[in-house]
Amino acid sequence: MGARFRQSADGYFLRTDSQLATRGAPRDALVADLAPPEVRGAAFGLLQSLDTVGSFLGPLLAMRLMLLWANDFRTVFWGAVIPAVLAVALLFFGVREPERHQDGKRINPIRRENLRRLSSAYWWVVGIGATFTLARFSEAFLVLRVQATGLPLAFVPLVLIVMNVVYAAAAYPFGKMADSRSHKSLLAWGLLLLILADVALAWDGHWGVVWVGIVLWGLHMAMTQGLLAAMIADTAPADLRGTAYGFFNLASGLALLIASGLAGLLWDSLGAAFTFIAGAIISSVALALLLLRRSA
């Protein structure tokens, strides 16, 4: 039963990541184009908050409809078409992109001369974002960690609900804070939260400490994800933002793949506690590099 849950959890995150791969870059580029620079952090924080609310309200609604319609998958999936159609209608009729003045025909933006226009500050954000992801493997391991404490299988989904509620509640306030505070300082605090979360999740004592780790994990996500998106917008040329977000998502996706693969190997060979300790070590190295860059 636990194995089946692990497979379903892994499948959930694979599907989620594939959705982000197709919509993440154009969505973030559109927000960066429409949001005034002085409130860009708040805009991305609100985006992360609403996106997270949808990610856990959708499955809860699907569960309710499955019970209401006697496990009729076909009807439930047809019901899911409704919000998708509403989203497309809102995109086409309610969102106006800023005007772009282009001379001649469109060309492929992924060209050597365009990549040279992406500054070292941009590539630093890409690197630090990939390092964050390398230290923060798939949330499926949070589910497995709580399950190992003896929580009944029926209540295991509470892990993602709690983490996402914290994430959604804190993303906008942290995003708004990013508009008036040092981005590097907030990144450092976000890494510190991740280190504390890893230490709590590695704890073999009371199960309550593990739940503290879940909350800290959600706070880390809220503090860093919208902030990194805003930093990409600040460091990339306006006409290359889609490309910039695409490379950022590519680097983060590869880092997540590597991190989750290594975490799985560590989990199977050395146990859950060592897996999260390894995450804390990687986070500590990233924090040290960030602080060294701040002092340079």
List the model feature ranges, each with a label:
Residues P83, L91-K105, L292-A296:
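Helix-loop junctions on the cytosolic side of multi-pass membrane transporters
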Residues M66, A170-S182, W267:
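Helix-to-loop junctions at the C-terminal end of transmembrane segments
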Residues T75-F92, F274-L291:
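Symmetry-related core transmembrane helices of the 12-TM Major Facilitator Superfamily/SLC fold
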Residues E97-I128:
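Juxtamembrane intracellular "pre-TM" segments in multi-pass secondary transporters
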Residues L57-F77, I258-F274:
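Transmembrane alpha-helix termini and helix-breaking/packing motifs in multi-pass membrane transporters
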Residues V81, S185-A200, A280:
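Structural signature of the two symmetry-related core transmembrane helices
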Residues M1-F5, L192-G205:
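C-terminal ends and interior cores of transmembrane alpha-helices
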Residues Y12-L50:
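Cytoplasmic helix-loop-helix junction between adjacent transmembrane helices
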